[in-house]
Amino acid sequence: MSFILVNPPLFWKLGDSRFSYLDVCRKIGDDPTGLRSLPAEHLGLSSIQAYCAKKGIPVQVVNGIVAEHTSVEPTFAEIEAIVREHGAPTLIGFSGTSHVFQATLRLARMCLERWPNAHTVMGYDFGTLNFEQLLRDYPDIHFVCRGDGEAVFATLAERLANGRGYDDIPGLAYRGSDGRLHANEPAALEIDTLPWPTRNELPQVLRGGFAAGVYASRGCPYRCSYCTLGQTSALFGNKSYRLRSIENVVEEMAYLKKEFGVRHITIVDDLFLTKAPSSQERARDFAEQLLRRDLGLEWMIDARVDSIDRDLFTLLRRAGLRKVFVGVETGSEEQLASYNKRYGLHEETQSDRLKVLRDLQIVIVPGMLMFHPNVTTTEVRQSLQLIDEMGSESHYQMYNRIQLYPGTPLYREYEEKGWAIGEWPVKDWEFRDPRAKGLSDAVLWASIQSGATFQDVRKVFVQHLEAWENNLDITEHSPPSIFDSAALQRSGAA
């Protein structure tokens, strides 16, 4: 009998060549220090594995992304190897975003063909927000975990192994014997009581040049329309944003340094710091504890621009903060409002906050959503100005576009407006103005050319933007569309 957790592979096909997700990260990593702060472990599956181990349930993990698989076959081969050693699977859990759903589906079918008595369960935000469609339309998915996965997976594994019922497990969605769908309300775990995630993948991750990750919280108090985390967090009501104690977080960081020689750690929270006084004080406590422990670690966080305070960040810098991901998204206040993301800052105030980071020599990793269907030259100019103010020389920020994730308000909005194209769950959109598409394609094309610098890409960006502003037709001089070309495919199934 075995219990298996699977992170399906994500890869791209270009002609006859295939590139793993991590290989693509290396190829587009125009910031030479970027990979060092990119966490590659799947802490969610590692946390479930640790929780189950504490309950006496041995769980094996197959991570197709860390293993850099470029098809589902090697992932399935790893599952087969586990079964040969530990016995036929009772429960197989799948994680991942909508972009690996086809890989998940194919792996589930392969597993059930080989071991027809096995059960399958899906999780992650994608499963949480789309459980009805998954259970209604995909018979190879038997269960869906909504919310925290540790207790759901452990309890379900135990019940199935002992032949007991599972209809009362909090957070479990399933098909009843009559075919009707049932969804139990999720329960928010006290995350400070959870065991630390297992670190079986970390040596391989570090050898690949990627970062160790630590989570200090779960959830998010905000509800941006494009983000799955905010929608998942809403299920927990007043427990939508849960914090670990700073002592627990710092102790785990010290453990990673001692046991694995880690020098850089990325705090993987979607939001480590807000403008709330309690959050600011917690960050101060974090810095002071790191300084007292004298761990000598460098680290990275995600923070909202309205949380940046000079005194606080001066202290954080002393304690090892070297990078901050700031989700500024766009230079347009109107577009931010359409995403339900409001800072309430004047333009000059936002610039002042970003200048604090630059003055302290803290690297800004910008979260830019440069393009959407109705983008205008005015907004693009505003966003370009914001990029210049941040001082980041990453190509990615100049061609990144809004992504549609099923279960979010933005996904529903684009469907209602007829903008979403393609098959569920991975849908795309088209530009309303072909000149915007020309700009987007030209910048992406320039960025993937060998040896292209940030200034090279920025020059192409400005040239095409000025042509658009002056109402010149640049589309016929644009390179082939990367997004529409059949030559470049993001895949998780083939």
Regions found by a protein language model. Give the residues of each.
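Conserved acidic residues
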Residues: 90, 142, 263, 322, ...
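N-terminal [4Fe-4S]-dependent radical SAM core
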Residues: 2-3, 9-10, 14-19, 24, ...
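Radical SAM [4Fe-4S] cluster-binding motif and immediate context
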Residues: 40, 192-364, 385
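C-terminal accessory regions of radical SAM enzymes
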Residues: 3-35, 49, 173, 378-494
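Glycine-rich beta-alpha loop elements in corrinoid/cobalamin-binding modules
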Residues: 51, 58-185, 398, 407
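Short, solvent-exposed turn/loop segments enriched in Gly/Ser/Thr/Pro and often Arg
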Residues: 97, 124, 270-274, 304-305, ...
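Catalytic cores of alpha/beta
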Residues: 132-137, 312, 374-388
